[in-house]
Every structure is written in structure tokens, then in C-alpha cells.
UniProtKB/Swiss-Prot annotation:
Residues 274-287 have a biased composition (Pro residues). Residues 192-207 have a biased composition (Polar residues). This is Uncharacterized 35.5 kDa protein in transposon Tn4556. Residues 132-348 are annotated as: Disordered. Residues 161-178, 227-273, 288-310 have a biased composition (Low complexity). Keywords: Transposable element.
Length: 348
């Protein structure tokens, strides 16, 4: 560092020597920002213009920046991955900027070199400040591992579990409660016509439904005795035993007679006597060819025409129609040559 300062003082004087002295005095990372602030101000106060800066002065400034970036890179690696991804990227950008400053240090223009150095110093200081803040925030949070408490384990053993022990009596009462909705499995007619809201919780006792009609009919055909209270009569004896005196005697009524069961569809017996059937009307007598016609029919039909049978002669039909209309003179007869035409033959 002393060698760079002496070479800078021999090669240039005035403003350049002051800048080299300030850069040599900054041997730590904390004074890098102040160095970047002094370089542009010193360059701008020289006789109203900017003088060229030697290569040795730029090399001194770049060497300080490079050392600062390398220190930040080592500091980022020492964090062992906590904020390594953040500070490592910024340190690499600062190191790349320093290489850009080294490549541009051979130029004759001092303004470009000062601008690159200023940006490099600012980037490296921001990276160092953010890395320290990340370390402080991570150290403030205590690292507590996950612990499984006994309160969160409902399926554990009874000594460690805090779940309430189920009561068997309450569970059975809940499963068989009357207010639980379910399908109505009762069959047969209901004794109560009330709705489900007014029905008692216990329900009503339903009678047993009778045997199916097909089963009762098959039992009666087989000759088996019917059950008490059935609607079918007792089976009759066969026809071969009807000639015996025992079969001719009427059957004695049973001692215990059950009341007859009626259904809503069956008609009720009436106490009024049944009406006699109305006899059918007698058909009119059939006339024979020798039977004379009644006088009324003979007065209505004129002479020579029969209402039941048409004659094949056309003049006869015309006379009959004229007589019915009341015409006094009969129609003129056809000539003999016109007799037996196709129309007359079709009427036959």
C-alpha cells in the first residue's frame, strides 16, 4: 500500500496526490464508502475541469474494491447456508464489477473509472449490510423442533390420550332412539289415519295380515280344513256320495259362528226385497205366404206394387211411384224395342 502511495505522489501532484493518500489510509472495509464519496468531489474542484488520473491510482482503488468483495464472499460462505443464497449472489456481482473496473482502468477518461468504482463500492456495502440483517433475523427466531403432544393423539393409549371415554349406555340409547328418521317397515292396514307428526312414538299394534288368496284356494282344493275366520266355505263332499242318506241330511250348524268379515269393496246386504225381472218383449208373429196382409198395409200400398219386393218391370215401378205421389195418369210405356236394356238386366 505504501508503494502505491509513493508512486502516485511521484507521478502526479495536487489533487491526484490527495486522492492517493486518502485511498492508502482506508485499510478497512468501513471507509470504502467515504473513499467513493471523496473521489468525484476532488476531481470536480480542479480548475473547473477533469484531469486524467494515472493507472497506478486506479489500480489502488480497484485493489481495495476487489479485497472488499472477496471478504464479503468469504463472510457469506461462513454462514453455512442460512443466507448464503442471498449474499453470495450480491458478492459475485460485486466481484464481476471489480473486474470491469480493472479492464477500464487503462482508459484516459477518469469519469468512467470513477463511476464504475462508485457503483462497485455501493453494491458491496449493500451486500454486507443485508447479510448482517439476515443473520440477526435468523438468530432472533428460536429453532424449536416439532413435538407431538398427547392432546393431539386421540388414538393413543388411555394413559396418554386426553379424549373423553365414550359411554356405552348413551351410545346404545342414541342408536335406538325413536326420533331417528328411518323407513316405515310396518305392513298391513293402519288403525290410525293421523299423520306421522301426531302419531305416538311407540307406534300402534298392527294385526297379522291373512294368508294369500292363492294359498287358501289351493288348500280348499286339496281338501284341507280351512283356518278359523277364513272367507271360503268348507269343502263339499264328492258327487258319488250324494245318494247316501247321510249326505241327504242337512248339515248341522256349528256351535260357534264367527262374524262375517266385510271389506270396503264388498256390497252391503240390503233388507228390501229384490225386484222381479222385467220380461222381454215378444217378437211380432212371422207371416207366411198364405196369410193375408193387414188392412192398413193394403190401404197404403197401391195396386200392382209390393213394398217388400221390387218387380223387374220398369213401367210397373213408375206406376207405383206415381201412385204414391198422387199422380192421376201413369207414365208412358216404353216402345217394344227398348225392353230388356242393360240397366234392366243389371237389376235382375
Amino acid at each position: 500500500m505504501a508503494r502505491h502511495a509513493s508512486s502516485a505522489s511521484e507521478s502526479s501532484g495536487g489533487v491526484s496526490s490527495n486522492s492517493a493518500a486518502i485511498a492508502a489510509a482506508s485499510s478497512c472495509r468501513g471507509t470504502t464508502c467515504s473513499m467513493a464519496a471523496h473521489i468525484p468531489s476532488r476531481l470536480s474542484t480542479f480548475g473547473g475541469g477533469i484531469s486524467p488520473v494515472s493507472v497506478s491510482t486506479c489500480s489502488l482503488v480497484v485493489s481495495n474494491t476487489t479485497w472488499n468483495a472477496v471478504a464479503n464472499f468469504a463472510d457469506a460462505r461462513s454462514t453455512r447456508g442460512r443466507d448464503f443464497s442471498f449474499s453470495f449472489a450480491l458478492s459475485r456481482s460485486a466481484l464481476a464489477s471489480s473486474f470491469v473496473a480493472i479492464s477500464t482502468s487503462s482508459r484516459s477518461s477518469a469519469s468512467s473509472t470513477a463511476r464504475d468504482v462508485r457503483y462497485t463500492v455501493v453494491a458491496s456495502s449493500v451486500a454486507r449490510r443485508r447479510a448482517s440483517e439476515c443473520r440477526r433475523s435468523s438468530d432472533a427466531l428460536p429453532s424449536t423442533p416439532y413435538r407431538d403432544s398427547s392432546a393431539s393423539r386421540r388414538g393413543g393409549i388411555r394413559d396418554t390420550s386426553t379424549a373423553p371415554i365414550p359411554n356405552a349406555a348413551i351410545s346404545s340409547a342414541r342408536s335406538s332412539a325413536r326420533f331417528i328418521c328411518g323407513p316405515d317397515t310396518r305392513t298391513g292396514p293402519r288403525l290410525s289415519r293421523s299423520s306421522s307428526e301426531t302419531r305416538s312414538p311407540g307406534g300402534t299394534v298392527q294385526p297379522k295380515s291373512p294368508a294369500p288368496l292363492a294359498a287358501r284356494c289351493s288348500a280348499s282344493r286339496a281338501g284341507c280344513p280351512t283356518a278359523a275366520g277364513s272367507l271360503l266355505p268348507a269343502p263339499r263332499p264328492p258327487a258319488s256320495s250324494a245318494s247316501s242318506p247321510q249326505a241327504a241330511a242337512p248339515a248341522a250348524p256349528s256351535a260357534t259362528r264367527l262374524p262375517r268379515r266385510t271389506t270396503p269393496s264388498a256390497p252391503r246386504p240390503s233388507s228390501r226385497p229384490a225386484r222381479p225381472p222385467i220380461p222381454a218383449a215378444r217378437p211380432p208373429p212371422r207371416r207366411t205366404p198364405g196369410t193375408p196382409r193387414p188392412a192398413a198395409a193394403r190401404a197404403r200400398a197401391p195396386a200392382g206394387c209390393s213394398p217388400a219386393r221390387r218387380t223387374p218391370s220398369a213401367p210397373t215401378d213408375r206406376r207405383c211411384r206415381a201412385a204414391r205421389r198422387g199422380s192421376p195418369r201413369p207414365p208412358a210405356a216404353r216402345p217394344p224395342g227398348r225392353q230388356g236394356t242393360r240397366r234392366d238386366s243389371a237389376r235382375l
